[in-house]
């Protein structure tokens, strides 16, 4: 359905009659959700909530993306089956999405019967349409692990600049691209063995077929984002250029995924069954809710279908996915909305700086998830522009907009209304010009949200909040309250303020649903919808006692968040990097389009292989005696240790073991420290080493930290060999 066709359908349809299926990209099930992921899920959730508030039938669908070589290797490293790993990660992802108010109607898994059946059905239909081809290809093969290696699981010496430890397809030092066969001294990231060349039969989706090209040239005209349209036209090229390449949709055993029908030992490549997972998750919901699944996904369906994705996976969602659907007997997406990447303080997220922030660490630090929802929304628009989380600006904007402007309105008026007027508004005040102005602005704000221009919606909302605060400042209810003769004016001022606050809460509801829920309870009203702009507060319904809605962001919370994430992602960082070399929304797979997001994490992969005795000898491990220990003010995780390591003076070390030990428990104990670690300047002081502690790979399932204690007889300063 083109954009023009969609507009005519929407114009002809009465409000509330639209049927809309919405998806976000599927997070890969080998790592934690971080704030970079959350940009997309918050963006999608705001849009979904906006549509629901219009009364439309909207289903927001998600799932974990669970197949592929990285999952298989990660599970092996952790001593788990792939199923055990993906079940654990699913629970963690679901927890994080719930924490941030991401309102999936169904959050499922691509490792499901529904997905297997649908993937097989689509494959068979494509094959019957002559769009599946088989070809012999030569690949790198690990003779130790007995598996074919994707490009990024091979490293070696760049053939151009001779930089060491470069990937099988490109050099991060000189920027050259090449074939894996061009690498000098190649080795397998998985085992360290030298790869050999081996041929195998692979299955290809014939995207180069003229039918696919013709369809895609027509379909691209309906995309809402000019950047997406331009990129697709670049990929398609001019008519007759034949720029589209066939797509390898199979992988060889061993592989965690679905076996291809009629092809023993061959499995669907993860990028084939992953988008089918959208439909599988929706089908699972339909079966539970009694919804007619086929009516939503058949060709010509009047229901709308939208995909929110990161711009790094536009290729899959605007070429392969629509073509797969078109030629397998399904409807095609109404539109695909791509967003940019997230930077923090103007730079890529960094573990060393603590800006690679996980969703769980944000919650554990005590930060309000609706602060982040608001901040992201204030930056987001309908383009693919990258957005930046500036932590100073985050604190200033939340404190100014949400506390200083918005929440302040209710806190200034509620007490007077309850104390002086039994909590009942003045009905005549509901027609005040200021109230009328806010009421008339709601349609415009809602339209900005639906157009994905969230920054415009919030800018307009905060401009109105400024006007309300100016009105309160001018009316001075605190002065009016001093003289009983001003009772009518005081009543009007408080009533206008609270009705304005209700309308501002309506405008903010898609962004801050939990605050809106608290406001609804405060006013004793039903859940707010856009149509409720015309339904003012009434004297017939007294307000309830005002409960504080939001606190200010404290700089100490930001510092604690950075400290918690500095050098973290322990299990999911090290293991996932070794297993996949990738993080990012639905992009951590053995696929080149994921490479941009994968490089930073993948660079750690080589460090997890075997090391030589010379490498180990570089680490100076010493026996240390804890002569003093104290908690670190302002930190939930750190203890400050004073250590005797047999030198003339003691060492000062900060250690993240506060959750496991009281300071007095450690004084006098012997432990082991890394004595030659470079001193590190921290907010709380200089840390001059590292104390060793043990923990389970899955600290959620098996919590606990245990410092190492040598046998009696060991003395401070002794070297551990």
From Swiss-Prot:
Location(s), subcellular: Cytoplasm
Classification via InterPro entries: aa-tRNA-synth_I_CS, Anticodon_Met, M/V/L/I-tRNA-synth_anticd-bd, Met-tRNA-synth_bsu_C, Met-tRNA_ligase_1, Met-tRNA_synth, Methionyl/Leucyl_tRNA_Synth, MetRS_core
Key words of the record: Aminoacyl-tRNA synthetase, ATP-binding, Cytoplasm, Ligase, Metal-binding, Nucleotide-binding, Protein biosynthesis, RNA-binding, tRNA-binding, Zinc
Domain tRNA-binding: 615-721
Gene Ontology molecular-function annotations: ATP binding; metal ion binding; methionine-tRNA ligase activity; tRNA binding
Pfam families: Anticodon_1, tRNA-synt_1g, tRNA_bind
Chain residues that bind ATP: 351
Residues annotated as binding Zn(2+): 158, 161, 171, 174
Cofactor binding mode and count: Binds 1 zinc ion per subunit.
EC numbers, comma separated: 6.1.1.10
Enzyme type, top EC level: ligase
Cofactor(s), by name: Zn(2+)
Family label: Belongs to the class-I aminoacyl-tRNA synthetase family. MetG type 1 subfamily.
Summary of subunit composition and partner proteins: Homodimer.
Protein's recorded name: Methionine--tRNA ligase
Taxonomic source organism: Burkholderia vietnamiensis (strain G4 / LMG 22486)
């Amino acid at each position: 359905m083109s954009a023009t066709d969609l507009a005519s359908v929407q114009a002809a349809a009465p409000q509330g009659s639209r049927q809309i299926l919405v998806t976000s990209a599927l997070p890969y099930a080998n790592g934690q959700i971080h704030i970079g992921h959350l940009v997309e899920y918050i963006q999608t959730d705001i849009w979904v909530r906006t549509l629901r508030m219009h009364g439309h039938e909207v289903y927001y669908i998600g799932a974990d993306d669970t197949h592929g070589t990285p999952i298989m290797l990660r599970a092996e490293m952790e001593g788990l089956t792939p199923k055990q790993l993906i079940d654990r990660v699913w629970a963690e992802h679901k927890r994080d999405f719930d924490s941030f108010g991401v309102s999936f109607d169904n959050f499922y898994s691509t490792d499901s019967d529904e997905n297997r059946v649908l993937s097989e059905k689509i494959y068979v239909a494509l094959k019957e349409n002559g769009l599946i081809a088989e070809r012999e290809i030569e690949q790198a093969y690990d003779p130790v692990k007995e598996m074919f290696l994707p490009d990024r699981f091979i490293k070696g010496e760049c053939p151009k600049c001779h930089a060491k430890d470069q990937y099988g397809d490109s050099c991060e030092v000189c920027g050259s691209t090449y074939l894996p066969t061009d690498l000098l001294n190649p080795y397998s990231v998985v085992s360290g063995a030298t790869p050999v060349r081996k041929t195998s039969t692979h299955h290809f989706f014939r995207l180069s077929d003229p039918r696919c090209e013709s369809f895609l040239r027509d379909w691209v005209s309906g995309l809402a984002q000019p950047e997406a349209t331009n990129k697709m036209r670049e990929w398609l090229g001019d008519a007759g250029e034949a720029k589209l390449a066939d797509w390898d949709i199979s992988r060889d055993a061993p592989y965690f995924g679905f076996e291809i029908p009629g092809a023993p030992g061959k499995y669907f490549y993860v990028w084939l069954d992953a988008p089918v997972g959208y439909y599988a998750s929706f089908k699972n919901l339909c079966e539970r809710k009694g919804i007619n699944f086929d009516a939503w996904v058949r060709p010509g369906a009047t229901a709308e279908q939208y995909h929110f994705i990161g711009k790094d996976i536009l290729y899959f969602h605007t070429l392969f996915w629509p073509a797969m659907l078109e030629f397998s007997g399904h409807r095609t997406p109404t539109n695909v909305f791509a967003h940019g990447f997230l930077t923090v303080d103007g730079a890529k997220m960094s573990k060393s700086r603590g800006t690679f922030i996980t969703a769980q660490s944000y919650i554990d630090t005590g930060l309000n998830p609706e602060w982040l929802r608001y901040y992201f929304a204030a930056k987001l628009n309908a383009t693919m522009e990258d957005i930046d989380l500036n932590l100073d600006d985050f604190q200033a904007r939340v404190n100014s907009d949400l506390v200083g402007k918005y929440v302040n309105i209710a806190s200034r008026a509620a007490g007077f209304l309850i104390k002086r007027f039994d909590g009942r508004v003045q009905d005549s005040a509901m027609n005040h010009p200021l109230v009328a102005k806010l009421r008339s602005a709601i349609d415009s704000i809602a339209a900005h949200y639906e157009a994905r221009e969230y920054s415009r919606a919030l800018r307009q909302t905060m401009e109105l909040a400024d006007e309300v605060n100016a009105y309160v400042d001018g009316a001075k209810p605190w002065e009016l309250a001093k003289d009983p003769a001003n009772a009518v004016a005081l009543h009007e001022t408080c009533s206008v303020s609270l009705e304005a606050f209700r309308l501002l809460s309506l405008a903010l509801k898609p962004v801050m649903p939990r605050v809106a829920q608290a406001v609804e309870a405060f006013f004793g009203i039903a859940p707010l919808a856009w149509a409720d702009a015309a339904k003012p507060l009434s004297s017939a319904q007294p307000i309830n006692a005002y409960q504080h809605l939001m606190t200010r962001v404290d700089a100490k919370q930001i510092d604690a968040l950075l400290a918690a994430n500095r050098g973290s992602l322990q299990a999911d960082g090290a293991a996932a990097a070794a297993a996949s070399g990738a993080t990012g929304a639905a992009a951590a797979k053995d696929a080149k389009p994921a490479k941009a997001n994968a490089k930073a994490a993948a660079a750690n992969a080589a460090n997890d292989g075997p090391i030589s005795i010379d490498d180990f000898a570089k680490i100076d491990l010493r026996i240390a005696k804890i002569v003093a220990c104290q908690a670190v003010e302002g930190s939930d995780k750190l203890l400050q240790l004073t250590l005797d390591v047999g030198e003339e003076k003691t060492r000062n070390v900060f250690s993240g073991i506060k959750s496991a030990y009281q300071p007095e428990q450690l004084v006098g104990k012997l432990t082991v420290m890394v004595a030659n670690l470079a001193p590190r300047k921290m907010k709380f002081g200089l840390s001059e080493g590292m104390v060793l502690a043990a923990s389970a790979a899955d600290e959620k399932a098996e919590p606990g930290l245990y410092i190492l204690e040598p046998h009696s007889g060991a003395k401070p300063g002794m070297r551990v060999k």
